[in-house]
Structures are given as structure tokens and as C-alpha cells.
């Protein structure tokens, strides 16, 4: 049965990106229904591919800028009718919560096969975030209605 609202928030990679997620979600929506897409974007395009990789992505092409993302929704035939963008403080809280989670996991699982890998990530994640990703990444949830 078709629904009034369909959402993919933070997992568009499952469908190969926001365009693939849009295609899947559209199958579930009633005409005039609202689609919610949560997607990262570049607040500031990294100057080099190396900086993009330091942000934890493969390439600058992994994400669009905010104007590029809104334009891509338009190109797919959607009106953006609302958006909620994470501010930098909110993004900081999101990232920092991961560090605490890793720390607590390491305390509870010191002998786990993945402990060394998690420790290595925790050792570099805060500095990597504040050096590269914090200025480059944005994230938003976009409400879309098909034209």
C-alpha cells in the first residue's frame, strides 16, 4: 500500500546515492506524498582529492555542494518544500558521540578481534574531524514533493 511519507535519512548509500534512494522511495509514495532524504553535502569543496580522502570519503565526487544537491533534486523532478540543515554545533555533537561510543566499546571489549582497529580509529578520528571534515561537511534532511 502506498504511503503519504517515505524517508531515507542517512542511508542513501544503500541505493547507490540519493538518486537511487529517490527511485526506491517513489515506488512507495502516493501522488503528492512527501519524500524525506537525509544527505551529506560539501559545505566547502575540498581543495584536493587528498583532503577529501582525509574527510573519510573516496573522492570529492562522493557528495555535491548544497546548491548542487538542491539542483539535483530539481533535475529529478522534485520541489524542495522544506529543509533542515545541521549546524556546526549539531554536527560536532554527532561526530563526538561516535568517539565516546568507541571509547566505551573498547573498555567493554578490550580483547575483541576488532579492538586494535577501533583503537586506531579513535586515535585519529577527533583530529581528522577538526582538521578536515568539520569545515567541509554539511548534512541536511530535505522534504521533496514530485512535480
What are the roles of these predicted feature ranges?
Residues 35, 40-45, 85-90:
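Short "lid" loop at the C-terminus of a central beta-strand within the Rossmann-like core
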Residues 13-15:
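A short His-aromatic
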Residues 8-11:
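A short beta-strand submotif of the Rossmann-like class I SAM-dependent methyltransferase core
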Residues 61-83:
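Short alpha-helix
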Residues 19-34:
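A short glycine-rich, Lys/Arg-flanked "PGG" loop and its adjoining helix->strand segment in the class I
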Residues 40-60:
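Short, glycine-/aromatic-enriched active-site segment of Class I SAM-dependent methyltransferases
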Residues 1-6:
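A short acidic, Gly/Pro-enriched loop at the edge of an enzyme's catalytic core
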Residues 82-147:
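Conserved Class I S-adenosyl-L-methionine
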Amino acid at each position: 500500500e502506498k504511503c503519504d511519507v517515505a524517508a531515507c535519512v542517512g542511508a542513501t548509500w544503500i541505493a547507490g546515492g540519493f538518486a537511487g534512494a529517490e527511485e526506491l522511495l517513489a515506488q512507495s509514495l502516493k501522488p503528492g506524498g512527501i519524500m524525506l532524504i537525509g544527505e551529506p553535502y560539501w559545505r566547502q569543496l575540498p581543495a584536493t582529492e587528498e583532503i577529501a580522502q582525509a574527510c573519510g570519503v573516496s573522492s570529492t565526487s562522493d557528495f555535491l555542494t548544497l546548491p548542487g544537491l538542491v539542483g539535483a533534486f530539481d533535475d529529478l523532478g522534485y520541489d524542495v518544500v522544506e529543509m533542515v540543515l545541521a549546524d556546526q554545533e549539531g554536527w560536532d555533537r554527532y561526530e563526538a558521540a561516535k568517539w565516546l561510543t568507541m571509547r566505551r566499546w573498547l573498555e567493554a571489549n578490550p580483547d575483541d578481534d576488532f579492538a586494535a582497529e577501533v583503537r586506531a580509529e579513535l586515535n585519529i578520528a577527533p583530529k581528522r574531524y577538526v582538521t578536515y571534515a568539520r569545515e567541509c561537511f554539511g548534512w541536511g534532511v530535505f522534504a521533496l514533493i514530485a512535480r
